[in-house]
Amino acid sequence: MPYRIRWEGHGVYRRFFGVITLAEFREANKEMRSDVRYEGIRYIISDYLEAQPAPEITEQDLRTYARHERLHFYDSPDIVQAIVATDLKNVQYARYYESLGVSPYCTADFATVADARWWIANNPRRGWNRPSLDATSTMAVPHV
């Protein structure tokens, strides 16, 4: 299993490592959503700092996956998702996924887990705030 799932007070932290296939990514989401704690969470942190997408994953795969994810919106509509990545391909895929506008979650990408946690802590409910960024910030612009 190229991922670990850790349940936290009001959310879940998922750490991926190695080369991740689309099937493994789907399995991680299935495992997360099938847990009884999923209905009560407020955030998902997906940490890809030690992972790379498998070369066969395409933007079409991401589009199809995003549409499928939209079906789960009402399972937990107040969830916010923070994607943590610095690998160029991971960042490109994260931003492409965000740009589709069909994700059931308010989604943003960050370069560090600390920045992701800050964003989550400063967004108590829907109507998420965009953080003000300065030239020294490591946070990416969230897409809401």
Predicted regions and their residues:
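Amphipathic, Lys/Arg-enriched alpha-helical "gate/interface" segment within cytosolic domains
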Residues: 1-144
